[in-house]
Amino acid sequence: GDKIKTLSDIQYIPYTEKSDIRDNYPYGLFAQPMKKIVRIHASSGTTGNPTVVGYTRNDLDMWSDCVARLCAAVGVTDDDVAQISFGYGLFTGALGLHYGLEKLGAAVIPVSSGNTEKQVKLLHDFGTTVLISTPSYAMYMSEVAHDMGISNDQLKLRIGLFGSEGCTNELRDKIEKGFGLFSTDNYGMSELCGPGVSGECYLREGLHFAED
């Protein structure tokens, strides 16, 4: 404690690293007993054991608050119909956005991933106004919609909440032209709940970090 006097002294503070999480797989770093854990998510584990995250009821409430703020910052309201085209499961993206959007009051369509023609049909038939997916899948959906003869003026899409992969400005422009919506970026990681860690607001001048 005596060493921490200036900002440069942060080097003396130990960090939790990926290796710590893997070495304590699956539950070794949980800070609460299992009777307090109400949900478990995990990363894909492509480079080793997956990162396992346990959530208490309070964690889920805080997480949905962060996601709701992220969505509100880009203009989502309780009048919106939000279609989630992330895969549901251990991946945090789908359920993270799902409960945040519900807390905001939006109507959520939990379509999950795949079956793109059906996805596009639901965009049209259900009057979806907010699309949640990876940017590359949004681009593909817009191409399928075009092939199906569905034009932008037949859809009600207005906002895209895209994440889980990088998105260049060129791809963003293509998505916006392809679907006629306002494209936004957000970021999350399993170690910090999931989506809701940071995201753009309607000004799109960088990601706002949720300090809480």
Residue ranges of model-derived segments:
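AMP-binding/adenylate-forming
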Residues: T56-L70, V81-Y140
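Glycine-rich helix-loop-beta junction characteristic of Rossmann-like nucleotide cofactor-binding loops
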Residues: A72-V76, G100, S151-N152
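Nucleotide 5′-phosphate-binding alpha/beta core
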Residues: G1-A42, G48-D65, R69-A73, D79
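Phosphate-coordination loops involved in phosphoryl transfer and adenosine-cofactor binding
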Residues: D78-D79, L157
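Gly/Ser/Thr-rich beta-alpha loop segments that engage phosphate groups in nucleotides
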Residues: T47-P50, G89, S190
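Hydrophobic/aromatic beta-strand patches that form the interior of the parallel beta-sheet core
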Residues: K5, P14-E17, Q83, I109, ...
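Helix N-cap/coil-helix junction residues
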Residues: D2-K3, V76, I150, L181
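Active-site glycine/GP-rich loop and adjacent strand/helix microenvironment
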Residues: L104-D212
